[in-house]
Amino acid sequence: MSDVRVGVIGIGYWGPNVLRNFAALPGVEVVAVADRDDRRLREVRDAYPHIAVTKDYADFVRLGVDAVAIATPPATHFPIARDCLEYGLHVLVEKPLALNVRDAELLVDLAERRGLTLMVGHTFEYNPAVRRVKQIIESGTLGKIHYIDSSRVNLGIFQSSVNVIWDLAPHDISILLYLLGMEPLTVSAEGNASIFEDVHDIAHIHMKFPGNTLAHVHVSWLSPTKTRRMVIVGSEKMLVYDDIADEKVRLYDRQAIPLASAAPGDTRCHYRYGDSVALPVDWVE
């Protein structure tokens, strides 16, 4: 099978990482890069002399590109992805797919009609620690999932093109959907623009899933510390996934168990404080 010929659009903040990883990936040939900035294109040409550079991603068709990776500012994702799908190219776009539901649905419909792959860069679905958490949930070790509480906060980086929900929450929401394997019945959110008017820098997102499973996502650009933590509470055990800690996944044998002799309205419980164990994670992706 011949290599997949890839073009990368956008070599700003995140694009160089996309380019570097595709260039090192077996079965992939990066044939072109598009960006509006001459300096960035010169840097790509110096580092990768064999890769064509252009200011216009429409040139990708002439250059024989099969698929594109889009790493441009979020507001440009929809028009660029739409153009590339219309060119007949498979598309990987960094999160978010679009800035509203209508545009996202249009892209999905276009990809389906053209028989093309449209994929969003929800990289945490391929993170070994997250996959380990999913294994634990599916094994039944945690029992019925009562709720998941997720926090992704830090100080900055403020952006004019997106608010904190579009910047950070796609990670947590994609992880939740992956872990639970279902979509929420209801979603609500509230936030605040504390520093710049009309740019929300803190938000709380609430979701209710089938089976009365609740989820809460807290995202913020206005926190003194950086946190990447998800607490999962089940009817049998509890688990913490901490992307910053050395021990990414820790299982807690803890629970509140109503007294068997308790009468209706009696909320006395037996609290089990069992061991906590750091679970091994296979870091081969």
Where are these regions (language model features)?
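N-terminal Rossmann-like dinucleotide-binding module
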Residues: M1-Y48
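Beta-loop-alpha module in the N-terminal Rossmann-like domain of NAD(P)-dependent dehydrogenases
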Residues: V18, Y48-D109
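Short, Asp-centered acidic motifs that coordinate Mg2+ and/or phosphate
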Residues: A32, A67, Y147
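Hydrophobic residues in well-ordered beta-strands that form the structural core
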Residues: K55, V93, L118-V120, D149, ...
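A contiguous active-site-proximal alpha/beta segment in oxidoreductase catalytic domains
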Residues: A75, A98-S160
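Mid-domain beta-loop-alpha active-site segment that forms a flexible
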Residues: G121-P128, V153-T186, V199-D201
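C-terminal glycine/acidic-rich active-site capping loop/insertion
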Residues: T123, E236-E285
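Contiguous beta-strand/loop segments that form the cofactor/metal-binding neighborhood of enzyme cores
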Residues: I173-R254, V284
